[in-house]
């Protein structure tokens, strides 16, 4: 939950996404009610978008669309939103792209240009798997950086969304013993992974002493990453694909 929680904060910093999640009537996607199911759904989507086939993407799109049809603002909502809005989906996809890039950059620094360009072009599927038209995805990394900077001006985390996200960062949805042990550490790590502008919106303080501890944490994660074979990460995504295909064949819900 370390880097993923930080990325969720980034996604929900757009008010339409934040309130869409907060007010969603789809209980099966509520992290506080079904945390492990929520994690499985997210993992499945990332696996399908990155290594899945066109058939896999059609399956996940159909399943997600069923849930998204119920997620739209009402007369009492603080902001107007619709889960099918490609602009909102583009922002979420952009954050997911940053999730993959951040994993590398926090541990090893920037990717080489050729690799970064290839990763970026593949990342468009994070949006086009749903309702983001291919032409809406910024054509290159320079255009993406411009889109990102423009988008920062429209970000805002209101108090209700902030409370929800702080609970996500401190794993408030876990049973008490796990929550008590993992919560403070996960909140610390999540704060470290956030850029300063997101920390400010979350009203999270960060000191030089905390940064030094965070750098130590990164060194531990760097060592762990070097010890775990790359194939192990691919295998985890493959498991998500196998699980989704099994569920589809047997008429069980995918998300």
UniProtKB/Swiss-Prot annotation:
GO cellular component: plasma membrane
Keyword Transmembrane helix: yes
Protein's cellular compartments: Cell membrane
Major place of residence: membrane
A Pfam family annotated for this UniProt entry: MPAB_Lcp_cat
Domain of life: Bacteria
TM ranges: 2-22, 168-188
Membrane topology term: Multi-pass membrane protein
GO molecular function annotation: oxidoreductase activity
Keywords of this entry: Cell membrane, Membrane, Transmembrane, Transmembrane helix
UniProt keyword annotation of rRNA-binding present: no
Protein name: Uncharacterized protein Mb2261
